Amino acid sequence: MKFFEYPYLVQREILENIEYQDLYLLSFVSIKTKKLIKLTQNSRLKDIRYLRYTCNDTNKQPFVDITPKNDRREVLMKIMERQTNKNDYFQLNVSGKVIYFRISNKSEPLLIAYFDPDESRSVIESIHNHNLDFFGDSVEYLWRTDDYENIIPQLQNISTCVEVMDTALDYANLEHFFSESPDLKYIRFYAFGYMEPFSPRSKSYQTECVEVVQPNSTNPFVLRHFQGKQAILRCSEYETSDLTEFVNRWKSGEFFQTFEHLSCKRYSTDLPQNEILNVIGAKHIDDTKTPPTYTVPKM
């Protein structure tokens, strides 16, 4: 590889001016190349907040993207089933497994990794192990999906972000999906009508952040059994007693001990904020102090 014939400073300057997508492609070329990128581009790699695998119901084959701290996402790779009518594949050894690749040029160059039908899990695991080694522990690894028919691979250091629509929900399958999923980071329920509460033992209540959007319902069903840190509720109506009971139980210190933040919005009219604040005995934050802030993964 002629690149290594250049002086080190020239190599470093070249890598400094390469986009993340191209750095990622080069990281597969050889162990030596990957080590050089990690050495010279350490600060850029640490600037990445999330690496995300997205696999939805319409396209069950994931693509991989990253989100740096400037929030400008870059797609790095697609992972697809191998097509027999293509002949321009090349092979690379990824974490001990030989994987077929192509460079797609339909709209812009994109690295595509391929798997045969019986080895999708092993290909994804090998690519994830490569990503762990290349990007390191400073990056948060997320698996985003709205397809609860397919169980998420058990990957190291992976957290799950799930979107659930209420169209003909299969509650048994959904409960099984949650129970088999890796660490639950974020769940968004979008329900046009009434949603049955899950079992009090459901793993869905253990997600770090839950968002419930119910434009035509008055049933924010997650509050009573929630064990996570943050709840975001968007409903057409609330029972004030449900909210005040939740907050008072939270304040008691006996319940919801990991909980940090509750956000509520009512679609029809504003919430009776003063009434709720009076019932729960809320105190105002001093204007001179900075209130705490909370973030969730961008879906």
Residue map of PLM features:
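Non-core capping and flanking segments associated with repeat-based/extracellular domains
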Residues: 1-299
